[in-house]
Swiss-Prot record:
Residues 280-319 are annotated as: Disordered. The active site is at residue 131. This is Protease HtpX homolog. The gene is htpX. One of its GO terms (biological process) is proteolysis. Pfam families: Peptidase_M48 (PF01435). GO terms for cellular component: plasma membrane.
Length: 319
């Protein structure tokens, strides 16, 4: 199902490229756009994960540089029966996280320093379990490729304004066609992102709760992240809005409503579903993830101290 969805999305993106190419240069422009789209599809499949990580200047960490964060992901991946993904930290005060990669064997998870600062051990585990669920369901291929292609289509729509209205080109639609392309192409690209059903977030929430062993860990994390995400701005996400749907909570300011134009379900609806799941679960489908040595250390996140100084008291029942 996910492979079919990915193919349909890529086909639609290709049609968008061809349509804008037609506006810019007629049939010749359409054929050039087709070649460019085919090349981008190929490139995105192999490189879109690296592109997204580079957009956010993500820093890869390991067991030595971020032992507790890395250990959480390692234990959760084992619970889920997944290969160990690459683990990254994003230097951003906004609490958020995402996963990327074309398949479970080539996947990566990334959490912001803001998330690692403000959440307890259990809440971090709930968030990373959610991201691993996306990897397990292979949502990451669709999300990452859609992000890169949607951004490119928006740029191509703007490109049409400078080169599509010239009388000397082969544009059969004139300046009106260029204006339509400028408006429709970015809107259509955004709608494609929304076409990736928001129900995948509910599915990842449920599977993530199973992986970490406690739905309330994730519900508590979602409340904290949503409360901060629209107060603490994320400049990198604002510059790259096509990647917003990849995050566990929409990182863009002003995206609060569960409506047709939202990339994420309403957070409170997700929390209610998780709390209902918690009531239904007598025991977790997997053993809850617990640290071997439940004491946060200053080296847990590179150069950050993972949220508190050495004199600050421990937080959470894991401490």
């Amino acid at each position: 199902m996910n492979l079919m969805r990915t193919a349909m999305l890529l086909a639609f993106m290709t049609v968008l490229f061809m349509a804008v190419g037609y506006v810019i240069g007629g049939r010749g422009g359409m054929m050039i756009a087709l070649v460019i789209a085919a090349g981008m599809n190929f490139f995105s499949y192999w490189n879109s994960d690296r592109m997204v990580l580079r957009m956010y200047r993500a820093q890869e960490v390991d067991e030595r540089s971020a032992p507790e964060y890395y250990g959480i992901v390692r234990d959760l991946a084992k619970n889920a029966g997944l290969p160990m993904p690459r683990v990254y930290v994003i230097d951003s005060p906004q609490p958020n996280a995402f996963a990327t990669g074309r398949n479970p064997e080539n996947a990566a998870v990334a959490a912001s320093t803001g998330l690692l600062h403000s959440l307890s051990y259990e809440e971090v585990a709930g968030v990373m379990a959610h991201e691993l669920a996306h990897i397990q369901y292979r949502d990451t291929l669709t999300m990452t490729m859609t992000a890169t292609l949607a951004g490119a289509i928006s740029m191509l729509g703007n490109f049409a304004f400078f080169f599509g209205g010239n009388r000397e080109n082969n544009n059969p639609l004139g300046f009106i066609g260029v204006l339509i392309a400028m408006i429709v192409a970015p809107l259509a690209a955004a709608l494609v992102q929304m076409a990736i059903s928001r129900t995948r977030e509910y599915s990842a929430d449920r599977r993530g709760a199973e992986i970490c062993g406690n739905p309330l860990w994730l519900s508590s994390a979602l409340r904290k992240i949503a409360g901060a995400a629209h107060v603490v701005h994320n400049p990198d996400a604002e510059r790259n809005p096509a990647t917003a749907h990849m995050f566990i909570i929409n990182p863009l300011s002003g995206e609060r409503m569960d409506n047709l134009f939202s990339t994420h379900p309403n957070t409170e609806n997700r929390v209610v579903a998780l709390e209902r799941m918690a009531r239904e679960m007598s025991t977790g489908s997997t053993a809850p993830v617990r640290p071997d040595n439940a004491v946060r250390k200053s080296r847990s996140v590179p150069r950050t101290g993972w949220g508190r100084g050495g004199s600050e008291p421990p937080k959470g029942p894991w401490s």
